[in-house]
């Protein structure tokens, strides 16, 4: 500011030289004197100023600061001298001087402005005070100087002073702003507490504060305190004996709040019935504020489930209308609050909930019309968007109950659209809304499927206008002590029983027998009525529905890009189960109609077979039907059908048991069926390869289903199958058939021998039974006679001779019977295979033979002691397991010895008869003992054959076993012939 005052003084000093005449010499001398006097005065003032300024914060070294009066005085005098010199030069160059003066003044102003800015940044409030004092002194000087000047100069000085004052006020305002910031900063700094010293000791009063916190009951706090586990909460409730106390009520309130919040958060379309039952188990009359708050919060958090929450409110409103009214009041107030605050999101959620409540008949449609009128009265982009979303939810309901009202709303929307005062996006939304109305709100039903749970007669509709004042009853959201807590709980329990029909079962049990009889009669009448209705069922024999069904399937197949899309379309048709087979037939017919086979149909059929078992069974039945009627198809259709079934078999979509209906023989096949089988197996070989196909056809679990395909019952059919598969290039599948055909004669012989052996075994079994009975009776008689003779040894010779003759006759007859019996038994034993003989019978026969031999040995011992030596000389019995060759060598030697030892008298003849009978018994026993050895030999042979033919095993591999049986029978037959020859010798 001081620099500006100096500039103004310079300008004023320069002023007379611009417009007045040039001064004379006398005037110049007077000015010099004045300048000297003023300089002396200024020097005195400067000394005083130096005394004041020394020691101030701005001058550390005692030198005069920039902008001080001392620094300003000398340049002022110099400028005055320069101006006087310029005035005394010449009067002709006024214009040039004027230009120079103006430029110098402008330069001085700029430099002065920069200097003032720098000084303002670095100066303090003390400097400003000193500057103001110096300015006042300079003003007084300038005033004393300006009194003698012209009015034009005064006017200029006044203008410059006004400019200076303006600049001064601006600087002061800047300083005041800066000082106010500094004061605020200092004030905040003073408000902060000083950081505690590290050495400070902790306060001694902290333990009592902690004790006070521990004494607080977390349950009695406003938020319920920390989380308490349910088990601990139940334990705490059980410990409280007074159920009406504050603590118990508070705990029950917390449990009620948690259960309501949990149930509301879990509800969806599928479990809404269960959630409502669990919700009614809680005292929602006491917690109606909690319930309303939970529903509104859940709906605001997830508006996509608004239809579910509206269904919950509708069910609760039908039982407790005051709860539905409370929720609707809070919704209306939320909408009004959001509308006043221009909160679009809150308006959207609230209006959507109100729209669904109108659809559920909880709120009246007048409320909807009022809200739409309010939104479209002064339309904006947001209000029109909210109105359109609201109309989408309840437009169909308004169309039914208030067509005039919704027509007025759409007229208003049309006017808004034509006025074009809204955004393009909102205009498109209005056009979409008209299109939705034209389609009949098909994507926005009144009540979604599965949520129409309340009858219209049971619902209570609330008539609540939009502009009324409502009480939201927020006090219900917080806990409050109930003096009649137990009574209210009992009242709610009775209400709950009535709602949930818990007492209906008890009342039904107390009813009399008459009621049961009446119920039975009613049920019988209903059943009879149902039967009559079933009798009246009309069947459409024109198959119009079948034709339409086939047409839809054909169009769906032809309009699909891939098989997955086609399967999805066909499944979504929801056709009845009776049409399952028709669908499979249609897929097969569409495949057969193609010029060439398309894999699309095979994949489609395979997908249906994997989806459901019914489709697989349908394709199995279709395979059999198609094979039986294959002669009706053309060659092209036949090829496509065979290839689609080959694909199903390769992918195991259809079991391989379907090949059971194929029988390869000259009589059971036609040219069409042979072509079908040829294409089928060639496709299978192309899909799987010959080794895998052969392995699948040799699977033991599937052999019963391949008997007709690879027949073994007749060599003619076997030869036909071999030739057929060889001709189509699949001869590798017939290796086992070829082996079977080679062994067929042997198997036929074994079969015939088995038939003969079975007949002979049946006859021999009957004869052996009769002979065994007669032999046992004769043996018993002989034993009795022997005992009698031994006991009566002292009797007379006459009685002894008679008894000897009787015994001889009996022995002769017994010998004949034994011969016939031994022949029959040897034949039966030779003809009967060791596997056919039962082990129990073998054991019984062995026991009987052993008992007979013991009896005979005892008879021989008692009758003739001389015979004992002959028996000792006879060869011993062959041990078990002795080879047949050794036995054959011993038997001729034994017969020769018998011929040498044969006596000539009658007694020796008797002994020879007995010896021959004993030898026959021994031979019989040896033949029976020989059978296990033969059996073990046959088993070892069969094991070796089974090892060799393990890989080529099939169901008809028993031909080798039959051949083994034949070999065994032939060996046995040869051995029996040898025995007979030896006996006859």
Curated annotation (Swiss-Prot):
Residues 130-161, 808-826 have a biased composition (Basic residues). Residues 1-11 have a biased composition (Polar residues). Residues 1-225, 497-534, 752-985 are annotated as: Disordered. Residues 18-32, 110-129, 162-187, 195-209, 846-871, 879-954, 961-979 have a biased composition (Basic and acidic residues). Residues 257-440 form the MIF4G domain. InterPro entries: ARM-type_fold (IPR016024), CWC22_splicing_factor (IPR050781), Initiation_fac_eIF4g_MI (IPR003891), MIF4G-like_typ-3 (IPR003890). Pfam families: MA3 (PF02847), MIF4G (PF02854). Residues 548-664 form the MI domain. Residues 758-780, 792-804 have a biased composition (Low complexity). It comes from the Eukaryota. GO terms for cellular component: catalytic step 2 spliceosome; nuclear speck; nucleus; spliceosomal complex; U2-type catalytic step 1 spliceosome; U2-type catalytic step 2 spliceosome; U2-type precatalytic spliceosome. Gene3D superfamilies: 1.25.40.180. One of its GO terms (biological process) is mRNA splicing, via spliceosome. Component of the pre-catalytic spliceosome B and the catalytic spliceosome C complexes. Component of the minor spliceosome, which splices U12-type introns. Belongs to the CWC22 family. This is Pre-mRNA-splicing factor CWC22 homolog.
